[in-house]
């Protein structure tokens, strides 16, 4: 940051770089952003028990609390009315002993999924979190059916990806936002912009 006056950085990049958005940003975007990070599945799998179990677990109070307690506002849950982590329409007895696979980026997505893993384990369902550090493979492995779901992107990115790659991956849940922050480099306040 020393080479620029200001930099706009997404919390997804700030956190792994050791930058704390809530204390280091001069200003931050609010939680009403259109760029919520989503859980996505292959089109046609939106209503499977695996998907519904995953949605319920990611929509849980446990996940919302984990996000609030661990990211200090750098990641904000957008789930309204979080539940207990389970969907009463899912046949968890039939899912018992199965594995649900999710492609995710390491931070914060895979970290958040660790909470989901514990929730699903209560019903004897294994969550296999497969970490990716790129933004192409997670959609390809879901579209091919190799992986059940992914959690790493926002809807505008997914829509562009589908259009450019003829894939059929759809959003089933908005989970959180990673607000953009404006950080000072050579400048330490917003005074230079106010002129």
Task: Tell me the role of every PLM-derived stretch.
Residues 2-9, 143-153:
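Alpha-to-beta junction loops
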Residues 35-53, 179-192:
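A bilobed periplasmic-binding-protein/Venus flytrap-type ligand-binding module shared by bacterial periplasmic
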Residues 1, 129-140:
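Short helix-initiation/N-cap motifs at beta->coil->alpha
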Residues 58-79:
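Periplasmic-binding protein-like
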Residues 16-28, 160-172:
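Ligand-binding "clamshell"
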Residues 81-101, 120-121, 190-194:
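Immediate post-signal peptide segment of exported/extracytoplasmic ligand-binding proteins
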Residues 28-36, 171-179:
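Short Pro/Gly-enriched coil loops immediately N-terminal to beta-strands
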Residues 95-107, 125-131, 195:
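Short, well-ordered beta-strand elements
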């Amino acid at each position: 940051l020393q080479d620029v006056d200001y930099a706009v950085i997404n919390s997804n990049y700030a956190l792994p770089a050791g930058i704390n958005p809530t204390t280091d940003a001069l200003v931050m975007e609010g939680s009403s952003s259109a760029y919520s990070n989503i859980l996505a599945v292959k089109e046609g799998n939106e209503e499977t028990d695996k998907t519904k179990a995953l949605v319920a677990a990611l929509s849980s109070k446990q996940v919302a609390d984990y996000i609030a307690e661990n990211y200090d506002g750098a990641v904000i849950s957008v789930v309204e009315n979080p539940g207990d982590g389970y969907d009463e329409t899912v046949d968890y007895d039939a899912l018992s002993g199965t594995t649900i696979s999710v492609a995710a980026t390491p931070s914060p997505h895979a970290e958040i999924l660790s909470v989901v893993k514990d929730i699903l384990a209560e019903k004897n369902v294994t969550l296999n979190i497969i970490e990716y550090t790129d933004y192409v493979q997670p959609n390809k492995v879901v579209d091919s059916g190799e992986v059940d779901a992914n959690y790493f992107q926002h809807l505008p990115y997914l829509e562009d990806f589908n259009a450019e790659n003829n894939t059929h991956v759809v959003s089933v849940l908005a989970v959180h936002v990673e607000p953009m922050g404006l950080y000072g480099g050579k400048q330490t306040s917003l005074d230079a912009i106010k002129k």
